[in-house]
Amino acid sequence: MSTKWEKLEGNVGVLTIEVDAKEVNNSIDAAFKKVVKTINVPGFRKGKMPRPLFEQRFGIESLYQDALDIILPKAYGEAIDEAGIFPVAHPEIDIEKFEKGQNLIFTAKVTVKPEVKLGDYKGLAVEKVETTVTDEDVENEVKALQERQAELVVKEDGTAADGDTAVIDFEGFVDGEAFEGGKGENYSLAIGSGTFIPGFEEQVIGLKSGDSKEVEVSFPEEYHAAELAGKPATFKVTIHEIKTKELPELNDEFAKDADEEVATLDELKTKLRTNLEEGKKHEAEHKVRDEVVELAAANAEIDIPEAMIDTELDRMVREFEQRLSQQGMNLELYYQFTGTDADKLKEQMKEDAQKRVRINLVLEAIIEAENIEVTEEEVTAEVEKMAEMYGMPVDAIKQALGSVDALSEDLKVRKAVDFLVDNAA
């Protein structure tokens, strides 16, 4: 087999591939063995039709497409290896010559991975992030715990205020007609939570148990139910009960209820401070890593093929679909609720997809430029770390991974980011 690679404009080139006649004949033979199994001919058992009779009745040309399906993937794969190129999309194949006893000649128009011209990626100036934890930070955490342990108690003589919970009956009307999903009984409405239509909760403030009121609101223009979007509505509301939060007293008992590993309020505050410090440090490290990567990517020159962005968009949509399924939703429901479609979703994701592709290409280029490698011991250590994290045997992790090649590449990327951080200004 012979291969010729001709680079065209941008990231496109043409492979001209010539395959020996012997391989062509072998592919036609393989195609016959495949096709003959599907043919019933009187006087012969299924799959036993003689080759000469087959060619006489159907013509040898009837085998050519199946033969091409057999020979092309292998020939194309060998050709891109020989040419040392990295396609990022399916090729455009053009068959110039294919017949029994003759060499196969075909061309493949290929979009390849772009050249990356790295800019400055050492000595990048990054902003230092403040990681100090103040007494106020700790007190805010204590207050958050106190809020989570609060009990709702009936507000006997009071009126509804922001932060209270009103137990209500409601029924909504648009143009004087009740609408589907607009009615509820004994519904616990947390005032100020923003769970109802804008303007609804504010009009409940000041009401008391036993009060009734007509609440006038308008549905948002982007409301998920298109038939209601932008329309004014009237809700008849009856208040059954007003509840308010009763916060627990801040003492050692509160601390023990909040965290069984502590015995006093002071111990709880110390633990909260430690957790906050670790969290801020972790957040600062991530911010620096993200910043150096984005700076290195911005400094590079790359002509990114649309095919790479399209591939990344498809991957992002699949990831989004998986997240939706974990919430009991699917894409069709999402499109219905948001008034979008597949094209609009991809358009929203396109900027992030471009950013992802650029960053990946730049990190790959840095790995090559700095000769970043991963040892077998480092891969083994990472597998053992994963086994401990997931509580699984090491062999089970290895089996789940199948090949450690992807893990090895991930570790190289991590090392590349480490390199950028270590060499930042």
From Swiss-Prot:
Gene Ontology terms, MF aspect: peptidyl-prolyl cis-trans isomerase activity; protein folding chaperone; ribosome binding
Entry function: Involved in protein export. Acts as a chaperone by maintaining the newly synthesized protein in an open conformation. Functions as a peptidyl-prolyl cis-trans isomerase.
Biological process per Gene Ontology, one example term: protein unfolding
Major subcellular site: cytoplasm
Keywords: Cell cycle, Cell division, Chaperone, Cytoplasm, Isomerase, Rotamase
Catalyses which reaction(s): [protein]-peptidylproline (omega=180) = [protein]-peptidylproline (omega=0)
Annotated domain remarks: Consists of 3 domains; the N-terminus binds the ribosome, the middle domain has PPIase activity, while the C-terminus has intrinsic chaperone activity on its own.
Identification of the protein by name: Trigger factor
Subcellular location: Cytoplasm
UniProt record similarity statement: Belongs to the FKBP-type PPIase family. Tig subfamily.
PROSITE patterns: FKBP_PPIASE
EC number: 5.2.1.8
Pfam families: FKBP_C, Trigger_C, Trigger_N
Domain of life of the native organism: Bacteria
Domain PPIase FKBP-type: 163-248
Alphabetical list of PANTHER family matching this protein: TRIGGER FACTOR CHAPERONE AND PEPTIDYL-PROLYL CIS/TRANS ISOMERASE (PTHR30560), TRIGGER FACTOR-LIKE PROTEIN TIG, CHLOROPLASTIC (PTHR30560:SF3)
Any one GO CC term of the record: cytoplasm
Protein source organism: Bacillus mycoides (strain KBAB4)
Underlying gene: tig
